[in-house]
Protein backbone atom coordinates (compact mmCIF):
# COMPACT_ATOMS: atom_id res chain seq x y z
CA UNK A 1 0.00 0.00 0.00
CA UNK A 2 2.98 2.34 0.48
CA UNK A 3 4.60 1.89 -2.94
CA UNK A 4 5.24 5.08 -4.91
CA UNK A 5 2.74 3.92 -7.53
CA UNK A 6 -0.02 3.46 -4.96
CA UNK A 7 0.76 6.77 -3.24
CA UNK A 8 0.39 8.68 -6.51
CA UNK A 9 -2.87 6.84 -7.27
CA UNK A 10 -4.01 7.79 -3.75
CA UNK A 11 -3.32 11.48 -4.38
CA UNK A 12 -5.34 11.38 -7.61
CA UNK A 13 -8.25 9.44 -6.17
CA UNK A 14 -8.58 10.98 -2.72
CA UNK A 15 -7.10 14.47 -3.07
CA UNK A 16 -7.99 15.64 -6.58
CA UNK A 17 -10.68 13.41 -8.16
CA UNK A 18 -13.40 14.89 -5.99
CA UNK A 19 -16.23 13.84 -8.34
CA UNK A 20 -14.94 10.24 -8.31
CA UNK A 21 -15.13 9.68 -12.06
CA UNK A 22 -11.67 8.09 -12.29
CA UNK A 23 -9.81 10.96 -13.96
CA UNK A 24 -9.00 14.60 -13.31
CA UNK A 25 -10.67 17.42 -15.17
CA UNK A 26 -11.55 21.08 -14.68
CA UNK A 27 -14.71 20.17 -12.74
CA UNK A 28 -12.67 18.51 -9.98
CA UNK A 29 -10.77 21.73 -9.36
CA UNK A 30 -13.90 23.89 -9.46
CA UNK A 31 -15.40 21.60 -6.81
CA UNK A 32 -12.16 21.69 -4.78
CA UNK A 33 -12.34 25.50 -4.69
CA UNK A 34 -15.73 25.35 -2.98
CA UNK A 35 -14.75 22.44 -0.74
CA UNK A 36 -11.59 24.18 0.48
CA UNK A 37 -13.46 27.44 1.05
CA UNK A 38 -16.02 25.71 3.26
CA UNK A 39 -13.42 23.69 5.16
CA UNK A 40 -11.22 26.74 5.76
CA UNK A 41 -14.28 28.70 6.91
CA UNK A 42 -15.48 25.81 9.08
CA UNK A 43 -18.77 25.75 7.17
CA UNK A 44 -19.04 29.52 6.66
CA UNK A 45 -18.94 30.72 3.04
CA UNK A 46 -16.68 33.72 2.38
CA UNK A 47 -16.92 35.17 -1.13
CA UNK A 48 -13.37 36.60 -1.11
CA UNK A 49 -11.88 33.31 0.10
CA UNK A 50 -13.90 31.47 -2.55
CA UNK A 51 -12.63 33.79 -5.31
CA UNK A 52 -9.07 33.21 -4.09
CA UNK A 53 -9.58 29.43 -4.00
CA UNK A 54 -11.13 29.50 -7.48
CA UNK A 55 -8.02 31.27 -8.79
CA UNK A 56 -5.69 28.83 -7.02
CA UNK A 57 -7.56 25.76 -8.25
CA UNK A 58 -7.88 27.11 -11.79
CA UNK A 59 -4.12 27.70 -11.87
CA UNK A 60 -3.50 24.22 -10.45
CA UNK A 61 -5.75 22.59 -13.04
CA UNK A 62 -4.08 24.55 -15.86
CA UNK A 63 -0.63 23.52 -14.64
CA UNK A 64 -1.63 19.87 -14.18
CA UNK A 65 -3.29 19.84 -17.61
CA UNK A 66 -0.17 21.34 -19.18
CA UNK A 67 2.14 18.85 -17.44
CA UNK A 68 -0.03 15.74 -17.61
CA UNK A 69 -2.78 15.91 -20.25
CA UNK A 70 -0.54 14.34 -22.87
CA UNK A 71 -3.33 13.66 -25.39
CA UNK A 72 -4.98 17.08 -24.77
CA UNK A 73 -8.49 15.67 -24.24
CA UNK A 74 -9.29 17.79 -21.17
CA UNK A 75 -8.89 14.80 -18.84
CA UNK A 76 -5.86 13.57 -16.90
CA UNK A 77 -5.84 9.84 -16.24
CA UNK A 78 -4.00 8.24 -13.33
CA UNK A 79 -1.31 7.02 -15.75
CA UNK A 80 -0.87 10.50 -17.23
CA UNK A 81 -0.65 12.01 -13.74
CA UNK A 82 1.92 9.40 -12.64
CA UNK A 83 4.04 10.13 -15.71
CA UNK A 84 3.91 13.88 -15.01
CA UNK A 85 4.82 13.42 -11.33
CA UNK A 86 7.69 11.20 -12.40
CA UNK A 87 8.93 13.89 -14.81
CA UNK A 88 8.45 16.88 -12.52
CA UNK A 89 8.62 15.71 -8.90
CA UNK A 90 10.42 12.39 -8.38
CA UNK A 91 13.72 12.88 -6.61
CA UNK A 92 13.11 16.60 -6.15
CA UNK A 93 12.62 18.79 -3.09
CA UNK A 94 9.50 20.85 -2.42
CA UNK A 95 11.28 24.09 -3.41
CA UNK A 96 11.67 22.86 -7.00
CA UNK A 97 8.04 21.79 -7.48
CA UNK A 98 5.85 23.72 -9.96
CA UNK A 99 4.33 26.85 -8.38
CA UNK A 100 0.73 25.62 -8.53
CA UNK A 101 1.68 22.37 -6.77
CA UNK A 102 3.31 24.39 -3.98
CA UNK A 103 0.20 26.56 -3.57
CA UNK A 104 -2.06 23.49 -3.51
CA UNK A 105 0.08 21.84 -0.82
CA UNK A 106 -0.03 24.98 1.33
CA UNK A 107 -3.81 25.14 0.91
CA UNK A 108 -4.13 21.45 1.72
CA UNK A 109 -2.31 22.16 4.98
CA UNK A 110 -4.89 24.86 5.82
CA UNK A 111 -7.74 22.38 5.36
CA UNK A 112 -6.05 19.90 7.71
CA UNK A 113 -5.07 22.53 10.32
CA UNK A 114 -8.70 23.01 11.34
CA UNK A 115 -7.98 25.05 14.46
CA UNK A 116 -5.68 27.39 12.52
CA UNK A 117 -2.77 27.25 14.98
CA UNK A 118 -0.19 26.52 12.27
CA UNK A 119 0.34 22.92 13.36
CA UNK A 120 -1.31 19.61 12.47
CA UNK A 121 -1.71 17.74 15.74
CA UNK A 122 -2.86 14.17 16.18
CA UNK A 123 -6.50 15.31 16.58
CA UNK A 124 -6.48 17.06 13.20
CA UNK A 125 -4.58 14.19 11.61
CA UNK A 126 -7.29 11.79 12.80
CA UNK A 127 -10.03 13.97 11.28
CA UNK A 128 -8.14 14.21 8.00
CA UNK A 129 -7.65 10.43 7.84
CA UNK A 130 -11.30 9.57 8.49
CA UNK A 131 -12.47 12.07 5.88
CA UNK A 132 -11.00 9.83 3.15
CA UNK A 133 -10.96 6.26 4.49
CA UNK A 134 -12.83 3.94 6.82
CA UNK A 135 -11.17 2.83 10.05
CA UNK A 136 -12.58 0.72 12.88
CA UNK A 137 -9.69 1.28 15.29
CA UNK A 138 -8.10 4.58 16.34
CA UNK A 139 -4.83 2.78 17.14
CA UNK A 140 -4.24 2.27 13.41
CA UNK A 141 -4.46 6.03 12.81
CA UNK A 142 -2.42 6.98 15.89
CA UNK A 143 0.29 4.46 14.98
CA UNK A 144 0.56 6.07 11.54
CA UNK A 145 0.82 9.55 13.11
CA UNK A 146 3.55 8.33 15.44
CA UNK A 147 5.49 6.95 12.45
CA UNK A 148 5.00 10.24 10.57
CA UNK A 149 5.79 12.78 13.28
CA UNK A 150 9.32 13.18 14.58
CA UNK A 151 10.10 13.83 18.25
CA UNK A 152 10.62 17.50 17.29
CA UNK A 153 7.15 17.59 15.65
CA UNK A 154 5.56 16.10 18.75
CA UNK A 155 7.44 18.47 21.08
CA UNK A 156 6.24 21.45 18.98
CA UNK A 157 2.65 20.20 19.25
CA UNK A 158 2.31 18.99 15.69
CA UNK A 159 3.53 19.24 12.11
CA UNK A 160 4.27 22.78 10.87
CA UNK A 161 3.54 24.05 7.36
CA UNK A 162 7.22 23.81 6.36
CA UNK A 163 7.39 20.24 7.63
CA UNK A 164 4.07 19.36 5.92
CA UNK A 165 5.44 20.72 2.63
CA UNK A 166 8.57 18.60 3.02
CA UNK A 167 6.51 15.51 3.89
CA UNK A 168 4.09 16.03 0.99
CA UNK A 169 7.03 16.40 -1.41
CA UNK A 170 8.52 13.15 -0.10
CA UNK A 171 5.12 11.43 -0.31
CA UNK A 172 4.92 11.96 -4.07
CA UNK A 173 8.60 12.17 -4.99
CA UNK A 174 10.41 9.57 -2.89
CA UNK A 175 10.02 5.93 -4.02
CA UNK A 176 11.31 4.69 -0.61
CA UNK A 177 8.42 2.85 1.09
CA UNK A 178 10.11 3.11 4.49
CA UNK A 179 10.19 6.94 4.54
CA UNK A 180 8.03 8.36 7.33
CA UNK A 181 6.32 10.62 4.76
CA UNK A 182 4.35 7.63 3.43
CA UNK A 183 2.07 8.09 6.47
CA UNK A 184 1.16 11.72 5.65
CA UNK A 185 -2.43 10.82 4.77
CA UNK A 186 -2.78 8.05 7.33
CA UNK A 187 -2.66 4.31 6.96
CA UNK A 188 -3.05 3.67 3.23
CA UNK A 189 -5.04 0.98 1.52
CA UNK A 190 -4.31 -0.42 -1.94
CA UNK A 191 -5.97 1.87 -4.51
CA UNK A 192 -7.77 -0.11 -7.20
From Swiss-Prot:
Keyword Ribonucleoprotein: no
Organism: Astacus leptodactylus (Turkish narrow-clawed crayfish)
Protein name per the record: Sarcoplasmic calcium-binding protein 1
GO MF annotation terms: calcium ion binding
Positions that bind Ca(2+) 2: 69, 71, 73, 75, 80
Pfam families (alphabetical): EF-hand_5, EF-hand_7
The keyword RNA-binding is assigned to this record: no
Keywords noted in UniProt: Acetylation, Calcium, Metal-binding, Muscle protein, Repeat
Binding positions (Ca(2+) 1): 17, 19, 21, 28
Signal peptide location: none
Amino acid sequence: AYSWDNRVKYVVRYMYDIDNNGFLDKNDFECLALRNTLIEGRGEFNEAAYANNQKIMSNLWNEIAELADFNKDGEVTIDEFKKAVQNVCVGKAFATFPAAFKVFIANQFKTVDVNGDGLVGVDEYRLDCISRSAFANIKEIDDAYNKLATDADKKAGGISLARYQELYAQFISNPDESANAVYLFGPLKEVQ
